[in-house]
Amino acid sequence: MKPESSGGAGTVIVTGGGRGIGAAVSRLAGARGYAVAVNYAADDAAALRVVRDIDRAGGRAVAIQGDVSREEDVGSLFDAAERALGPLSALVNNAGITGGFSRLDALDADVLWRVLSVNVAGAFLCAREAVRRLSTRHGGRGGSIVNISSLAARYGGAGEWIHYAASKGAIDSLTVGLAREVAVEGIRVNAVAPGLVETELHAAAGAPDRAPRLGPSIPMGRAGVPEEIAEGVLWLLSPASSYVTGAILAIGGGR
């Protein structure tokens, strides 16, 4: 028998939940009453730090390894989360990579396929698994999915990362299409599209100074911080957004 969720708001899986926006979402979800499954691909130390933070604040969390681009890992992730924390109520599709900066004519095909595998296939596989568990059509009790997109999908990433921007464009399509597909099955599907945010993403892409350098060009005059993005995610997960589905919430300081 599956345990009842130890979080008053239910169980949420946050993919890529150990760092950056994912870590902020995981911590805030724990503070808002969710039992949190903090997924990570390789950095177990970062994921365990987030789990400890949630535990110390009085919440409940577990760290679960899994590569979201691998179908078998996705199934194992969801099974482990429900065994440890109780029935799923929400998914935050956050795991993603940039593949680094490159013009398209210099882009390595292996990099392209890896970005699409993690950012697109990974999100689709996780959303599929969530629907199978949440949909009233499959005996579920409904729930919420929030995908992490990017304003890069709107602007295209020219000269930097068209490959990354295109992968986030796919997330926007997934959000709108799936929202309509499961709207009468008790599942809301939305996305948050962050703009320039101070995370490790920029350093991983090879430009650690990118956020402070470009911040003054944003209408609000600065880059965002992960906690600001997390607030949008938690609103979309919450009953306060009960009539919102298929929305792509831009959080970009006016960009």
Which ranges hold each PLM region?
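C-terminal substrate-recognition "lid" of short-chain dehydrogenase/reductases
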Residues: 222-251
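Active-site helix of classical SDR
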Residues: 127, 167
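Substrate-binding pocket helix/loop in short-chain dehydrogenase/reductase
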Residues: 102-104, 108-116, 214
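Alpha-helical segment proximal to the catalytic Tyr-Lys
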Residues: 132, 180-181, 242
